[in-house]
Design a protein with these regions (language model features):
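Nucleotide-activated sugar donor-binding and catalytic core shared by glycosyltransferases
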Residues: 1-374
């Protein structure tokens, strides 16, 4: 069968590539085309566009680059019609993928959505559009299945694909990691995860770097991603006493005592590595106020949303200050009770998420559903 798959950012590329790998095991004649990143390409997906040319963060950035976004959508629509896939698989990335879902449905293509947009947090009216244009939702958070069922959407909870990644990762060698990155053996590490998009890094990393001088006994290490130029990080870091590692986020977390993490998938990754964290988020003023007006949930981090309580501290917008970061990081490093409670909550979080196997289950659901509908 022919599969058209679209992911618009780094985490989506990772999850989509794992899904492709599992589909190939079950469908030996599978062919793939779509939009995504290096990991999808490595699995044999013929890319129309790389997500680097598509990823914009927040209302303002999207508005400024609206022409580019609309051009990408138009190119993608044409490519789907030319390719004539058996199914269109959309991975998160709602601003782009909702438009593709509507189009693909109208043209008679089967549409599967893997990794739900956070419509339960805002824009709940979008659920009605999902009900009309998506044949099957494959969700990765425990509470999402019940949410969609309330609206009559065909939905299956497949588990969280991050558990698949962690199962593959295993235990790294600390000494090798330290030597490879010229890190000291004696000083504990604090990880800085500023995000995977250029706009995020430019906004978040300068704020995170302000805390480094308050903790001279620790070594701060920035998690760089392959989709961004090394010069971007180096330009922001300047002469600060901070290290940069590239494409080694899991090894970094495995060897860290605490982390400052930009809100997103990385907050859950950090928790699954049992690293105490502070969640950070800052948008442009307009984007933030618009989001605040629209958002319907109490928390922004996946950890707190899944647990339905504040497990990790969220420093958002005006609260994301040097003083607050120093205060929270101090507690994570030196308050034993705070550390123990957070780690206990992390264990409960893992219990709620269940076991690995999301990619395999999602692939099975897709292939079986297509067989039934043929």
């Amino acid at each position: 069968m022919k599969y058209y798959i679209i992911a618009g950012e780094a985490s989506g590329d990772m999850h989509a590539s794992n899904l492709v790998a599992e589909i190939k095991k079950k469908d030996k004649k599978a062919e793939f085309r779509g939009c995504g990143g290096d990991l999808m390409k490595a699995q044999g997906v013929d890319l129309l566009k790389h997500y680097r040319t598509m990823a914009y963060m927040g209302f303002v950035e999207v508005a400024v680059n609206l022409r580019k976004v609309l051009d990408s959508i138009a190119q993608c629509k044409k490519d789907i019609v030319d390719y004539q896939p058996d199914v269109v698989i959309l991975v998160d990335y709602p601003g782009f993928n909702f438009r593709i879902a509507d189009f693909a449905h109208e043209k008679g293509f089967k549409v599967f959505y893997y990794i739900s947009p956070q419509v339960w947090a805002w824009k709940r009216r979008r659920v009605r559009k999902i009900q009309k244009s998506v044949d099957k939702m494959l969700v990765i958070l425990p509470f999402e299945e019940e949410f969609y069922k309330r609206y009559g959407v065909d939905v299956t909870y497949v588990g969280h694909p991050l558990l698949d990644e962690l199962a593959k990762f295993g235990n790294g060698n600390r000494s090798m990691f330290l030597r490879r990155n010229s890190l000291g053996e004696k000083r504990e590490i604090i990880a800085l995860l500023p995000g995977s998009r250029k706009q995020e890094v430019k906004r978040m990393l300068p704020v995170m770097l302000k805390v480094t001088s308050h903790f001279p006994e620790y070594q701060f290490v920035v998690a760089g991603v392959s989709s961004l130029e090394k010069s971007l990080y180096k330009g922001i870091m300047g002469k600060a006493d901070v290290f940069l590692v590239e494409n080694q986020t899991y090894e970094l977390l495995q060897n860290s005592s605490a982390a400052l993490v930009t809100s997103g998938t990385a907050t859950l990754e950090t928790a699954l590595f049992s690293v105490p964290e502070v969640v950070c988020y800052k948008a442009t003023g307009f984007s933030y106020h618009l989001a605040k007006w629209m958002i319907k949930v109490k928390f922004i981090s996946l950890v707190n949303l899944i647990m339905d309580k504040e497990v990790v501290k969220e420093l958002i917008q005006g609260d994301l200050t040097e003083d607050n970061l120093v205060k929270e990081l101090n507690q994570l490093l030196h308050d034993g009770n705070r550390q123990r409670q957070m780690l206990e909550d992390y264990e409960d979080l893992q219990d709620r998420l269940g076991n690995a196997g999301a990619s395999e289950k999602a692939a099975s659901v897709i292939i079986e559903s297509l067989k039934l509908k043929k």
